[in-house]
């Protein structure tokens, strides 16, 4: 048996080794023939050499039998009979040789066939490796291109994220600055209010000591100054509100932008999912085609593996072999192309899946950011809610103030009726008690009799003159106390007028073309519409109350001048109808004394106060529990801020 040769690295080298092996086998056959034929002459040896060369050239595909070589020798030299005779004996000897040579030749043929098959397999493997390398290189290039695209998209997304973060930081800083400025303005406002309250307290003390035209001028000047400061504060607050509105508009625009971006990403996700579905369908179709090709390939392999029918020793036709090779190459090429296509589709699917994952992560990040933005929006809406609460409190306070005013008017009427009755009693008593030589005292008594808030018991006519004089002097002392009380009530009225002026500043009339004079006839009795203008009605009512109070102040000053001027005193026995008419005309004096006597700022127990009247005590208590707008002047600004939003 011949030793099996190793697989050559290259087909050209395999061909050379095959030829060298064939030449070596031919040499060994020649040597064997020479050994078995010792009696052959030299000429025959030469002929054998020539025949051997001819035999080498003739047997390019394999080795022939010794009979064939002998026939070839006879065909070449028919003339020489000696050589024929000489060759007959070795041919006969060679015919007697055992069949081992034919067995060796068949073995050599089998080895040659196996080597050819191995050569084909190696060539096929080399082609497959080359194709696989080409596919890998193509896939690597495609992956590099996809990686570059992903890096570019990543850079763009990073820049967008940076810009969004920067804008968010900018908005946060602006909102913080606005909040700090608003806080400072509120602190400044509180300081100014405290300063104003301190100034009013000092002015009150000075007015209690001395009431003159100089103090009035100073008070008016300081009032104007405070009003200017309040106007400046109002302008600053309007600027802050405008900036806050701009920030809110920018916030809304940014929220809309985020919504649009989210819708865009969702649309892109839908497109990508549709593409993935189409790729999956194509992949299924390609799998089906691959299965078909694999079935056909398995059938071909099965057909090739089946034992062929016994053929004649002749070599099969090369045309059939070439046809089979072409079929096999075609099927292998189709299979390889299908495998390449499947690999590309799998790579594309992986890339699409990675993109979908990245987009899902981005959407999750945006969804995580949305609650933070909602919290910020809620934080921005918290001051608006506080404004609404303050607005509601302001409405309730105005309603309570209106109720208190109505009760005060009723109480003032009752007090006026009681005062008129007391005056009638006093005039009757003075006419009975009048003595000669006491006319001046009686005149002075009549001049101050209209301001007596308490009833004096009737004096019997059968008393002695000294007792009547002592009672009369006591009555005069009480009248002097009442005059002091009237001065205190006048100061309280000035303070009430100042608070109403502050309310005018803090409650501006927001209707276009409206003014304080137009709102004055309302007298505080205002009603808000169902949809809008509720705060406007409140502000107009407050301004109307202030104007009405100003008119009452003018009439009350005239009344005080007539009451305190001794030159215009009536005669002792006259009933003083002008004073009664003035008292009825300026009935707000009693109302002012009531409101001033119950204010917690003064805190002084006066004679003739409403605490003496049991019907006025619950009203006073209610007014102390629910003070008016003078105690909290910052509320109307918030009402002013909410008016344009309600109109929307």
Swiss-Prot record:
Compositional bias per record (Pro residues), positions renumbered to this chain: 1-11
InterPro entries registered for this protein in UniProt: GM130_C (IPR043937), GOLGA_cons_dom (IPR043976), Golgin_A (IPR024858)
Keyword list, A-Z: Coiled coil
Cellular component terms (Gene Ontology): cis-Golgi network
Biased composition (Polar residues): 50-62
Biased segments, Basic and acidic residues type: 121-139, 441-453
Region (Disordered) residue spans: 1-84, 119-139, 356-376, 434-461, 508-549, 600-624
Protein's UniProt keywords contain Coiled coil: yes
Family to which this protein belongs: Belongs to the GOLGA8 family.
Name of the protein this chain belongs to: Golgin subfamily A member 8G
